[in-house]
UniProtKB/Swiss-Prot annotation:
Organism: Chlorobium phaeobacteroides (strain DSM 266 / SMG 266 / 2430)
Gene3D superfamilies: 3.10.20.590, HUPs, Isoleucyl-tRNA Synthetase, Domain 1, Valyl/Leucyl/Isoleucyl-tRNA synthetase, editing domain
GO BP, one annotated term: leucyl-tRNA aminoacylation
InterPro entries: aa-tRNA-synth_Ia (IPR002300), Leu-tRNA-ligase (IPR002302), Leu_tRNA-synth_edit (IPR025709), M/V/L/I-tRNA-synth_anticd-bd (IPR013155), Methionyl/Leucyl_tRNA_Synth (IPR015413), Rossmann-like_a/b/a_fold (IPR014729), tRNAsynth_Ia_anticodon-bd (IPR009080), Val/Leu/Ile-tRNA-synth_edit (IPR009008)
Protein name listed in UniProt: Leucine--tRNA ligase
Protein family according to the UniProt entry: Belongs to the class-I aminoacyl-tRNA synthetase family.
Gene name of this polypeptide: leuS
Pfam family for this entry, one: tRNA-synt_1
Keywords: Aminoacyl-tRNA synthetase, ATP-binding, Cytoplasm, Ligase, Nucleotide-binding, Protein biosynthesis
Positions of short motif 'HIGH' region: 40-51
Keyword Nucleotide-binding: yes
CDD domains, sorted: Anticodon_Ia_Leu_BEm, LeuRS_core
PANTHER family on file: LEUCINE--TRNA LIGASE, MITOCHONDRIAL, LEUCYL-TRNA SYNTHETASE
Enzyme Commission number: 6.1.1.4
Length: 816
C-alpha cells in the first residue's frame, strides 16, 4: 500500500471526530492533566505555520499523557471579540459576527486537519451570549466588591482607532504606526492595584519562565521608599515627593512635578504663568510612552517657585517636566542629579547644580553614579550625619530622622496602575450597568445584556461608541426610574481572563462553574503560548482568578501551574512572518503539500521548542522521507505495484539482544524527552531507532509496535493506520505508552574517559555502574595515562559514574 497521507489523514480525523475519541470524562479515579493553548483570535488571514508550533506541542503532551493513564483535558475555543473584526465591518459593512463566524470555521478546519486531539464538545466562543453572560457576571462581582469604578481619567487615546488603549497596549500600537495622545475621558476602571502585593508574592510559587516572572515583577514595580515634605517658600504649604533614596536628600538640588500635578499652575509665578500653561497643554497631548522614553530629549519649565531642602535648608527650584507621571508616587520627585541619570541629563540641559553625596569612583562630571555599593559623603548637618555609611544603614538612619522630625513617612508604592477597562467600540461585551437620572448606578439583573444591531460601526467623534446612537437599546425605565445604559464595551482581554474555567464546565447555565469540577481540573497543568502576553493577558487573568478565589468560585490562588513559551518560527528569509514582508507560509498550503504528520514532526524537529528558528522547506522534505521509512517497516513493497497493498508478516520471535537494548534505550530517551518537552531530541532518537531496524532488516513485531506507540503522539495519523494494518482492532490512541526496562536500557559496558589535570589522556571500557575505586584503579593502568602520572602526586580523584575519571596532580618534590 502506498503512503497516501492525504487519504489516511482524512480517514483518521473523521474517525476521531465521529467517535469523540478525545472527550474528557469526569472520572475522578484517574489522575487529571489539563493542557491548554492560549486560544487564538480568529483573524481573516488564517493560520500560518508559525501558529501551529504551540498547538502541536500541546497536542503531543495531551496524547502522551492519555497514553500514560491520565484523564486529559485538552480544549479549544475562540477569543473572538476585538478590533480587527470591527475595523473590517467599518470598511465593508459586514457585521463583525458574520466575519467572526467565517474566520472561526476556517481556523477550526485547519486545526482539525492537523489532527489535534481537542475535545471539540467543549468548544467556546467569547462572543457567544452563553459565554459573555458570565464575563458580565464577573464584572458585576467586581463592581459589588468596589473593584470596578467610574473615573474621569487621562487616558491613552488612539486617534485613528477612536478608542482608549490600556497602558500595556500603547507601545505595540505606536510601533504599528498609530497616533496615541492623552486626553481626559469618563472610564470604567478595574482596581488591579488592590491585588498588587499578592500578584507579586505569588509569582514565587509558579513554574514559569523566569524572564516572564521578572517582566511581571517589573511591571508591578514594587518599591520601598519615603514620602518627604518640602516647605514651599512664599506659599505657606508643603510639596510631598516620593523617593526610594532618602539617603541622597543632601544632594537634592531641585524638585520636579508632573504637568497634571494639582499645584502645577498654582506654583507658577506671574512671570512664568503663560509659559507654564503652554507647557502643560503640550505635555497633555503626549502619550506616556513619549513622555517616559529613556532616549527622549528632556523638556521642562521652571515654575518660578522654590522649596526648602529639609536636610540642608537650601532653596530648591520647582520645575515641571513631562517625564514625571502623576500616577506614580505623588507626582512629584526630588532630583539628585549626581546619582540619577535622568536628573543628571535634566540638570545639564538647564544648568542646575550637581552635588555628589555618594562617593563615586569617577566623579559625576560626565555621568551620574547610581550604584548602592559606595558610601555617603557630604551628607551631614548639626542634627544628623550619614557620612561613611553604606546604603542600607544610611537609608534607615535618614528615614528615622525624617519620621522623628515629622518631615516624612515610609511608603511602599507600585508602578502598576488600575486597569482602564472601557473601550469606545461596538464589538465587545456590553458593560452591564445602568445610569439613572439621580446619578446612581445599578447593574443589569437579566444577563446576558446583548449588543443591539447597529447601522454603522464607526466610533463617534465625541469618543462614545456606536451604541450611543441606538436609542431604543440605550434608554429605558424600571422601578428605580429612567436610565441610560453604558455605551462603553469591555476590552478584548475580558473574555480571555477566565476562559480556562469555562472549558471545564461549558454547558453550565446555572453558575459559572461547578465547584466539584473546578476542584478536580484546576489548576491548568501546562499552559503554552507566547511571551508577548507576559504583562497583558497573563497578568489580567491572574488578577481575575484571585478575585474569583476571594469569592469562593475557585479553589486555587493561581490559574496556571506551569507556563511554557514556545519560540517563534521565522519565515525562510529569517524574518518574522508578516504580510508586509511577503514571507508568510500559510498552514493550509504545507498541509496540502506534505500532510499533517510531516508538518507536526518538522516543526518539533526544528530545534528546542523555546528557541526562535527559521522555516526551511528542504527540512520538511527530509521528514517526509523519514515517514516513508516508517511506512516501509510495515509495507516493505509499497513501491511495487503488484505487492504494495500487502502488509509485512511481522516476526513474533524476540528481538536480538543488541536491538532489544536499543529499543529500551529509545523508549527511555523518548519518555524522558517528552516529559521535559524536548521534542526535537525525542524525534531524533526515534529516527536512529528506525535506521537501526532498517539496517538490520528487522521485522520483529515488538520493535514495530513499540516504535508506533512512541511515535503516535507526534505523528498520530500514520501510526494509527499502521497499527491497524498489523492487526490491531482498537485504535492506537487508546493504547498505553511503552515502558522501558531500566536493566535492559543501560549499556552493560561503558567507555570511560581519563583526564589528567583536565586534559584527555586516554580511555578504557568497564562494566556499567562499576564502583569508583575500581574505575580509579583501572584508569591508573591505562597505557597512555601511566606516563602522565609518573613522578606526580595525585591531589584529587574525580569520578563521574560511567563517564569520566580525572586526576588532579602536582609534581612530586624528591627527598634529599
Amino acid at each position: 500500500m502506498r503512503y497516501d497521507f492525504s487519504t489516511i489523514e482524512k480517514k483518521w480525523q473523521s474517525f476521531w471526530l465521529k467517535n469523540n475519541s478525545f472527550s474528557s470524562g469526569e472520572s475522578t479515579d484517574k489522575p487529571k492533566y489539563y493542557v491548554l493553548d492560549m486560544f487564538p483570535y480568529p483573524s481573516g488571514s488564517g493560520l500560518h505555520v508559525g501558529h501551529l508550533e504551540g498547538y502541536t506541542a500541546t497536542d503531543i503532551v495531551a496524547r502522551y499523557k492519555r497514553s500514560c493513564g491520565y484523564n486529559v483535558l485538552h480544549p479549544m475555543g475562540w477569543d473572538a471579540f476585538g478590533l480587527p473584526a470591527e475595523q473590517f465591518a467599518i470598511k465593508t459593512g459586514t457585521h463583525p459576527k458574520n466575519t467572526t463566524e467565517k474566520n472561526i470555521s476556517s481556523f477550526r478546519e485547519t486545526l482539525q486537519a492537523m489532527g489535534f486531539s481537542y475535545d471539540w464538545s467543549r468548544e467556546i466562543n467569547t462572543t457567544s451570549p452563553d459565554y459573555f453572560r458570565w464575563t458580565q457576571w464577573i464584572f458585576i462581582k467586581l463592581y459589588e466588591l468596589g473593584l470596578a469604578y467610574v473615573s474621569e481619567v487621562d487616558i491613552n487615546w488612539c486617534e485613528e482607532l477612536k478608542t482608549v488603549l490600556a497602558n500595556e497596549e500603547v507601545e505595540e500600537k505606536v510601533k504599528e504606526g498609530y497616533t496615541v495622545i492623552r486626553k481626559p475621558l469618563r472610564q470604567w476602571v478595574l482596581k488591579i492595584t488592590a491585588y498588587a502585593e499578592r500578584l507579586l508574592d505569588d509569582l514565587d510559587e509558579l513554574d514559569w519562565p523566569e524572564n516572564v516572572k521578572q517582566m511581571q515583577r517589573n511591571w508591578i514595580g514594587r518599591s520601598e521608599g519615603m514620602e518627604i515634605d518640602f516647605e514651599l517658600r512664599c506659599h505657606n504649604r508643603k510639596l510631598r515627593v516620593y523617593t526610594t533614596r532618602p539617603d541622597t536628600l543632601f544632594g537634592a538640588t531641585f524638585l520636579v512635578i508632573s504637568p497634571e500635578h494639582p499645584l502645577a499652575l498654582k506654583l507658577a509665578t506671574a512671570q512664568q504663568l503663560v509659559a507654564v500653561t503652554q507647557y502643560i497643554k503640550e505635555a497633555k497631548l503626549k502619550s506616556e510612552l513619549e513622555r517616559t522614553g529613556l532616549q527622549k530629549d528632556k523638556t521642562g519649565i521652571f515654575t518660578g517657585s522654590f522649596a526648602i531642602n529639609p536636610a540642608t535648608g537650601d532653596p530648591l527650584p520647582v520645575w515641571i517636566s513631562d517625564f514625571v507621571l502623576t500616577s506614580y508616587g505623588t507626582g512629584a520627585i526630588m532630583s539628585v542629579p549626581a546619582h540619577d541619570s535622568r536628573d543628571w541629563e535634566f540638570a545639564k540641559k538647564f544648568g542646575l547644580p550637581i552635588i555628589e553625596v555618594i562617593k563615586s569612583p569617577d566623579g559625576v562630571d560626565d555621568a551620574a553614579f547610581e550604584g548602592k555599593e559606595s558610601v555617603s559623603i557630604n551628607s551631614s548637618n548639626p542634627e544628623i550625619s550619614i557620612d561613611g555609611l553604606h546604603f542600607s544603614e544610611a537609608f534607615q538612619i535618614m528615614a528615622h530622622w525624617l519620621e522623628t522630625k515629622g518631615l516624612g513617612e515610609r511608603k511602599v508604592t507600585y508602578k502598576l496602575r488600575d486597569w482602564i477597562f472601557s473601550r469606545q467600540r461596538y464589538w465587545g461585551e456590553p458593560i452591564p450597568v445602568k445610569h439613572y437620572e439621580d446619578g446612581s448606578i445599578r447593574t443589569e439583573s437579566n444577563l446576558p445584556l446583548q449588543l443591539p444591531e447597529v447601522e454603522a460601526y464607526q466610533p463617534s467623534e465625541t469618543g462614545e461608541s456606536p451604541l450611543a446612537t441606538m436609542h431604543d437599546w440605550l434608554y429605558g425605565a424600571d422601578e428605580f426610574g429612567s436610565f441610560r445604559r453604558e455605551t462603553n464595551t469591555m476590552p478584548q482581554w475580558a473574555g480571555s481572563c477566565w476562559y480556562y474555567l469555562r472549558f471545564i464546565d461549558p454547558e453550565n447555565n446555572a453558575q459559572l462553574i461547578d465547584p466539584a469540577k473546578e476542584k478536580y481540573w484546576m489548576n491548568v497543568d501546562l499552559y503554552i503560548g507566547g511571551a508577548e502576553h507576559a504583562v497583558l493577558h497573563l497578568l489580567y487573568a491572574r488578577f481575575w482568578h484571585k478575585v474569583l478565589y476571594d469569592l469562593g468560585v475557585v479553589s486555587s490562588r493561581e490559574p496556571f501551574k506551569k507556563l511554557f513559551n514556545q519560540g517563534m518560527i521565522l519565515g525562510e528569509d529569517n524574518e518574522k512572518m508578516s504580510k508586509s514582508r511577503g514571507n508568510v507560509i500559510p498552514a493550509d498550503q504545507v498541509l496540502k503539500d506534505y500532510g499533517a504528520d510531516a508538518v507536526r514532526l518538522y516543526e518539533m524537529f526544528l530545534g528546542p521548542l523555546e528557541q526562535v528558528k527559521p522555516w526551511n522547506t528542504n527540512g520538511i522534505e527530509g521528514i517526509s522521507r523519514f515517514l516513508g521509512k516508517v511506512w516501509r517497516l510495515v509495507y516493505p513493497d509499497s513501491e511495487n505495484p503488484d505487492q504494495r497493498d500487502q502488509a509485512a508478516v511481522l516476526d513474533e520471535n524476540p528481538l536480538p539482544e543488541i536491538l532489544q537494548r536499543r529499543m529500551h534505550k529509545t523508549i527511555k530517551k523518548v519518555t524522558e524527552d517528552t516529559d521535559h518537552l524536548k521534542f526535537n531530541t525525542a524525534i531524533s532518537e526515534m529516527m536512529v531507532f528506525v535506521n537501526e531496524l532498517q539496517k538490520n532488516g528487522c521485522r520483529q513485531k515488538s520493535a514495530v509496535e513499540n516504535l508506533l506507540l512512541m511515535l503516535a503522539p507526534y505523528a498520530p495519523h500514520i501510526t494509527a493506520e499502521l497499527w491497524q494494518a498489523i492487526g490491531h482492532t482498537s485504535p492506537i490512541s487508546a493504547e498505553p505508552f511503552p515502558v522501558f526496562d531500566p536493566a535492559i536500557a543501560e549499556d552493560p559496558v561503558v567507555t570511560i574517559a581519563v583526564q589528567v589535570n583536565g586534559k584527555l589522556r586516554g580511555r578504557f571500557t568497564a562494566p556499567a555502574k562499576s564502583p569508583e575505586e575500581s574505575l580509579v584503579d583501572m584508569a591508573k593502568h591505562v597505557d597512555t595515562v601511566i606516563k602522565f602520572l609518573e613522578g606526580q602526586t595525585i591531589v584529587k580523584e574525580i569520578v563521574i559514574q560511567d563517564k569520566l575519571v580525572n586526576f588532579a596532580v602536582k609534581q612530586s618534590i624528591p627527598n634529599h
